[in-house]
Amino acid sequence: MAEPLFLQSQMHKKIWGGNRLRKEFGYDIPSETTGEYWAISAHPNGVSVVKNGVYKGVPLDELYAEHRELFGNSKSSVFPLLTKILDANDWLSVQVHPDNAYALEHEGELGKTECWYVISADEGAEIIYGHEAKSKEELRQMIAAGDWDHLLTKIPVKAGDFFYVPSGTMHAIGKGIMILETQQSSDTTYRVYDFDRKDDQGRKRALHIEQSIDVLTIGKPANATPAWLSLQGLETTVLVSSPFFTVYKWQISGSVKMQQTAPYLLVSVLAGQGRITVGLEQYALRKGDHLILPNTIKSWQFDGDLEIIASHSNEC
């Protein structure tokens, strides 16, 4: 059956979260400190569920395991990607993620390379993107001394910015920023620094200094260089094409016909409204929708005014 898979997904409370997932997208959030919406996920810590069509009610991990034909008969043992929206009402911890080899050996799951599309950012908002240490020994010394002002590289951000964050990159999302994150399907994070804050039980969150030093990369991160193409009714920006995923921004105005060029596509509507037509069937689209266009869909048409982030795995 050639139909898009619309998804219902899980919210995650975070010490740094807020309520902008409700304000911006109208989502039903569980608390005023909701930090993450795992919009397209088959990770066991937050599995999305199909909410329409033949597979209504089926969890995405189960669908991937039992109907691999929907995903181009992908050879990846697990659904390889995870799409999130993050609301940073405060700084996230300064952190780093391992690569596949380290994560599989030590954590039993994929590594975590990710990327961020900035949906909104307060005036003066910043991220941490890299560090100033010239060696692992200097890195260890600066962490031990708590010399964060000299170690951490801060840069200002605004809505529409994009950052590629390979495994091994020291990073943190700053206060007042909302992002859409495309990442490998992993929940492994090593915290380097958490601003000495305490949770609602008065406890500090665990740090992972030795693991962080093991996996951190020395040298400045190299951000992706987006490529832009305009056709009638469609502006396409290839935000990044990496060994793990390719991510696009589609700005749609009017009617646009498209072809499936990947085994399947992950689609997130960040703004606007419209519809997608597959064969003879039409499906409404609105801001905050997340869906998968499976391999059974070879072509479709978008109508309306829509801002979309789409992605596909490159590990199929």
Curated annotation (Swiss-Prot):
Catalytic activity: D-mannose 6-phosphate = D-fructose 6-phosphate
Domain of life: Bacteria
Keywords, alphabetical: Isomerase, Metal-binding, Zinc
Record-listed E.C. numbers: 5.3.1.8
PANTHER family for the chain: FRUCTOKINASE, TRANSCRIPTIONAL REPRESSOR MPRA
Metal-binding found in the keyword field: yes
Gene source species: Streptococcus mutans serotype c (strain ATCC 700610 / UA159)
GO MF annotation terms: mannose-6-phosphate isomerase activity; zinc ion binding
Record-given protein name: Mannose-6-phosphate isomerase
Entry-linked NCBIfam families: manA
Cofactor binding comment, as recorded: Binds 1 zinc ion per subunit.
Sites where the protein binds Zn(2+): Q95, H97, E114, H171
Similarity section: Belongs to the mannose-6-phosphate isomerase type 1 family.
Active site: R191
Cofactor: Zn(2+)
Class in the EC hierarchy, top level: isomerase
Stored Pfam families: MPI_cupin_dom, PMI_typeI_cat
GO biological process annotation, one example: carbohydrate metabolic process
Source lineage: Bacteria, Bacillati, Bacillota, Bacilli, Lactobacillales
